[in-house]
Amino acid sequence: LPEGVCVDVVPVGEANWAARPYGFNDLFKGALSDVSTLFMGKPILTWAMERGITLGGNEDIQNAPLFPICQTVDELGKVLRWMITEPDREEGKFIWLSARKLSANDLSDQANLRRLVAQREVFRKKDWSLLAANHEKSVFYQLDLSDAAESFAKDKIVLPKALPEDNPLMKRIHNHMFRSQVMKILGEAYKEEEQKAFALLREGLVSSVLGSKQQPCLNVYRDQIVWGRSPVRIDLAGGWTDTPPYCLYAGGNVVNVAIELNGQPPLQVYIKPSDTHKIILRSIDLGAMEVISSWDELRDYNKVGSPFSIPKAALALAGFVPEFSAEAYASLDVQLEAFGSGLEITLLAAIPAGSGLGTSSILAATVLGAISDFCGLAWDKNEIGNRTLILEQLLTTGGGWQDQYGGVLHGLKLLQTNEGFNQNPLVRWLPEYLFTDPEYRPCHLLYYTGITRTAKDILSEIVRGMFLNSEAHLGILSEMKAHALDMYEAIQCGDFVTYGKWVGKTWEQNKALDSGTNPAAVEAIISKIQAYALGYKLPGAGG
């Protein structure tokens, strides 16, 4: 086809087709006798003259019978070639002259819509496979893959194969999650494909750390203790936009605030040298202890619910396992001997589990910061925040960056990132007037409901929607990202009423993204206070 020329084949009656070529930029209005009236991008008078035919009078082109009805595909091919590129093709001219012809208006009235829909379904079924196979030049992996998966499952279309390693990482992630979704709809085993997608995401995030391996060195005297403390955080707007993979291809905007409880940072870590070449882990609030004497014991960090998953993964990232270490050692015992001591790490989380205040991520950041000081690694707060994101990938809990940066960076702020695997946020500090002024300070209440959920369960379903380019998920996330800027503006202006209403809007967005956010027990609490509050929300991924 020449550039700018399109072809439409319209079903007419029970067995015939109308051949309808046209120009992409044709206005399809104007008299046939007017030189400015275009057909396939050229004056229709010129088109008719080139083909030795005469078109009648001053009739508008919209009403002109130009489109022949054909009985076979062979006729369609011949007449279309004559109409578009081969004006001297006599057999095409004969078909056009002898056929019954319809105008554009006639086609609108006489098209067989049932056949048209069926025809489009057949084409669509074939096109899905072609789009997937031609992914290098097609938009397949940019489409709403959750919708595409429904079509693949319904029509039993053969799944696209797993993409080889030379393809872009994000495209391979989309590929595995798409395959997983089709299998899930068909009732087949899908978890393996799903886990491959999550594993590739971890690979992309962890690869940045593998390039800069660590050499921990004892940085304290034997009678010294490193003491790390952090507040927790409350997210006010934009939560979820910080979560991979969404933030990797769209960036994220989050407004949150660091808070202490009862005047104290509730998350604390103590590290001191040990006389034995072992790593001793203790948790004050859980009353647990574990002694680690091998790399395999240290690598056992990806069990959700383990009391010491976080310090184990943090020690791994600090270079206490071979894959993250700049030096080679025969064993952990030998490494600790070269280090100069063992380590005793004590954790205290003076806050209920599953509170939604970012406890696990901020505790991880606090542990990483304390280890950095103890081992002379000199990580700044940006590096600690980034390594916390990676640590959570190692734990397979996933999660974004707003929790750790919300706690490690003081006060009230807007955090923003751009797309890409480097998710170090730009920080825009906000005035704390609405939180500290005597007129507004008593208007804030942090209330513990006693209802908990593991963020991993919530994350996995929403992240699955992100991987699949789900229009429902991505649309809400885009609104959340814009809403964070509205919240930033309201706080900047010291507008308490608008700020309160925007907190309420954040809650509505969270419910739209995750219907399980508002169980009956939470709704019962809300029903008692909603008439007296400008806004309310559960913090985090459901509180």
Model-predicted segments: where are they?
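C-terminal nucleotide
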Residues: 6-11, 16-18, 32-337, 386-397, ...
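Catalytic metal-binding acidic patch
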Residues: 1-3
